[in-house]
């Protein structure tokens, strides 16, 4: 029996995304050790908005959005955040990078071969999730974001929930 190359390629294209990318859970969990040795537990942030931001030191759009993202999180009492350094590099390199580009939210290094189970594998960086106070994903962003994007997503989620 002959199997055409096009047929095999077509089958791979249909199957590969299901194998590589998982769905993000409706109410994801996340418990990671931050670079400063503390534990960040998303479940402990219920009642607040949480910005979960996948980034990397080599990602120019990630670096460009960091100051505005940091200022947004620092300015809002109802918002916290976590930066997930999604790269295969030495932990100290990330710490050194952050020494020159500090942020006002904790950072954890994520193993690219074993990322958090409740979040889909990022298809690009930066990837940002806005988690609502009830723990649900209010919005997922692929690419750089601005403060206005987060504010708009928060307003949309609030109006959808009747708050």
Question: Predicted segment positions?
Answer:
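N-terminal "domain-start" segment that seeds a small globular fold
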Residues: 19-42
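Short loop/turn microsegments at loop-to-beta-strand junctions
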Residues: 28, 50, 125-126
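Bacterial N-terminal signal peptides that target proteins for export
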Residues: 1-9
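N-terminal signal peptide c-region/cleavage motif recognized by signal peptidases
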Residues: 15-17
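Structural microenvironment flanking redox-active thiols in thiol-disulfide oxidoreductases
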Residues: 63-101, 112-117
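Cleavable N-terminal signal peptides
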Residues: 9-10, 20
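Short active-site neighborhood of thiol/selenol oxidoreductases, capturing the structured segment around
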Residues: 42-60
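Thiol/disulfide oxidoreductase modules built on the thioredoxin-like
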Residues: 99-104, 109-155
